[in-house]
Amino acid sequence: MAASIPETQKGVIFYENGGELQYKDIPVPKPKANELLINVKYSGVCHTDLHAWKGDWPLPTKLPLVGGHEGAGVVVAMGENVKGWKIGDFAGIKWLNGSCMSCEYCELSNESNCPEADLSGYTHDGSFQQYATADAVQAAKIPVGTDLAEVAPVLCAGVTVYKALKSANLKAGDWVAISGAAGGLGSLAVQYAKAMGYRVLGIDAGEEKAKLFKDLGGEYFIDFTKSKNIPEEVIEATKGGAHGVINVSVSEFAIEQSTNYVRSNGTVVLVGLPRDAKCKSDVFNQVVKSISIVGSYVGNRADTREAIDFFSRGLVKAPIHVVGLSELPSIYEKMEKGAIVGRYVVDTSK
């Protein structure tokens, strides 16, 4: 174990789903034989964190729980079986904290589908604390010297949308429509799509979000509160429909609409998780147009490495708002109102 590790730390914890989010002193966890102990400097805040707190997904959380799964910090200790890491390395805590590494899914690099997957901020205390543990195999390697506040959202939001774009099977010059284009996921999806050579159409609401979309390099913006017919407008703007659609919004209706404006032989990718939602697609339309509808979960270790590399080369940058960890409850309030533009990051020292 390294020196100067305190016994207690500041963190945000809740004891029942939907209960009070308490900013308080809690114990510093001890790393297991296969784990790193990471001094978390910054953590992104994801919509999944809100679901974990509310407990409204069909997967139960551990309780009590420290949320968060976009933690960026410095390795300060490690278990005796850890290899390939050293004290002082920059490391990231991802949604997938650990997996069995021996099942069919892990063997095929689909670790997120592992039946024994351990999830940061859900089944494993996450990054809304100053010190957190992560399986050394799954922890993300971050180049030393990286701005940890800016890289934090890449660890989930960035990896997730990058994997989704890969799942759309697009080629340079193709149109990709991003539903929810100016939120935490969408704002990164726009940049990854541009960096991958795609033409980007964004769907969201409001002048502030339209400006952000354009500032990020998006080509055509549709305000869903003003458009009279979104499918028709997408088809007209793209001269035939989007080759791929990335659904990061939490609107069941938006998902249904996307099956109507995707191009023949195109792919609709589902990422956002509206509560109790169903994906509705006209079977005749889907068959005759040869449309694919796929779900895209989080990326694997290779996707993570590639997503961070895009960031390190300056090709993507999360539009972030940095506030103190103690302000987390107010961020959740903004999330529930749909009032967030870009991505919130919490500073664990405040």
From Swiss-Prot:
The keyword Cytoplasm applies. GO terms for molecular function: alcohol dehydrogenase (NAD+) activity; zinc ion binding. It comes from the Eukaryota. SMART domains: PKS_ER (SM00829). Its EC number is 1.1.1.1. GO terms for cellular component: cytoplasm. Zn(2+) 1 binds at residues 46, 69, 156. Homotetramer. This is Alcohol dehydrogenase 1.
